């Protein structure tokens, strides 16, 4: 994991919004969470790492999808990713994981290869629905939390984390030709594509980023009740640990927003990171939340 938001797909070294079988996860669920994580991280690697052509990346993801389908059908998968699909097959069987959530993740990775602009917020949130929200829904499935209100709160948290990661990573994504800032919001702030591609830091671009960051923070807060629900569902110390971990994840995202604000929303040229002091702040805020 990098020093960004700890634990939505966005570069294999930056795969975020995912608690990777940490010490706070209920021990019985750590193998399942690790299997899901490695499935997602490996797919992210195929989509975003190295110097393969877009066509080669898409071909690899198609082969990976075929292995997932074989895995879900309890059939033999290829040797190439046996280390991913053997444990995942056991987890799917043991926990009855919804396969559509795993295929949604793959479709988002595929989209990241072919799509570099988003017309409006609705289009961006549709991407988040497949790139980030499945992570939360898979975890809730493992926790036995299935009610619609909790799923919606999880979606809000995961989408917010993905959006925060986008606004944190503008200095990385824009030079690669990826602009996640919705086109429909540019004109309202007097921004055009030329300014963004030139990574021009001026009042217009920083106001645009600020508006997007504030929106992500508001979305995050829609999930504020979910940690309590998870803790109540699991019960006991395991419930407290899972709820506390979720509060830490949320506070990590909000802390990144604070750090984006602290550099005056200049993330077109500067990427804020969390440090040890931030970790202490996150821990304390999560305890009080």
Summary of predicted features, one role per range:
Residues 1-161, 167-289:
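Catalytic cores of Mg2+-dependent Asp-rich isoprenoid enzymes
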């Amino acid at each position: 994991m990098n020093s960004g938001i700890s634990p939505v797909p966005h570069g294999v070294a930056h795969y975020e919004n995912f608690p990777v079988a940490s010490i706070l996860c209920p021990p019985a669920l750590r193998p399942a969470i690790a299997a899901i994580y490695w499935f997602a991280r490996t797919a992210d690697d195929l989509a975003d790492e190295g110097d393969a052509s877009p066509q080669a990346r898409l071909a690899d993801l198609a082969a990976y999808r075929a292995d997932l389908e074989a895995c879900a059908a309890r059939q033999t998968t290829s040797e190439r990713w046996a280390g991913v699909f053997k444990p995942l097959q056991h987890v799917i069987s043991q926990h009855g994981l919804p396969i559509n959530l795993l295929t949604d993740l793959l479709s988002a990775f595929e989209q990241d290869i072919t799509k570099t602009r988003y017309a409006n917020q609705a289009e961006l949130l549709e991407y988040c629905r497949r790139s980030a929200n499945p992570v939360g829904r898979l975890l809730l499935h493992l926790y036995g939390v299935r009610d619609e209100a909790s799923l919606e709160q999880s979606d809000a948290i995961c989408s917010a984390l993905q959006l925060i990661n986008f606004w944190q990573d503008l200095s990385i994504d824009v030079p690669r030709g990826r602009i996640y800032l919705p086109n429909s919001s540019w004109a309202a702030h007097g921004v055009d594509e030329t300014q963004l591609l030139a990574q021009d830091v001026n009042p217009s671009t920083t106001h645009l980023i600020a508006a997007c960051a504030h929106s992500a923070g508001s979305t995050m807060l829609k999930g504020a009740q979910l940690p309590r629900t998870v803790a109540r569902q699991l019960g006991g110390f395991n419930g407290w640990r899972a709820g506390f971990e979720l509060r830490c994840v949320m506070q990590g995202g909000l802390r990144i927003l604070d750090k984006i604000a602290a550099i005056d929303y200049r993330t077109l040229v500067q990427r804020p990171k969390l440090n040890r002091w931030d970790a202490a702040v996150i821990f304390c805020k999560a305890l009080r939340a």
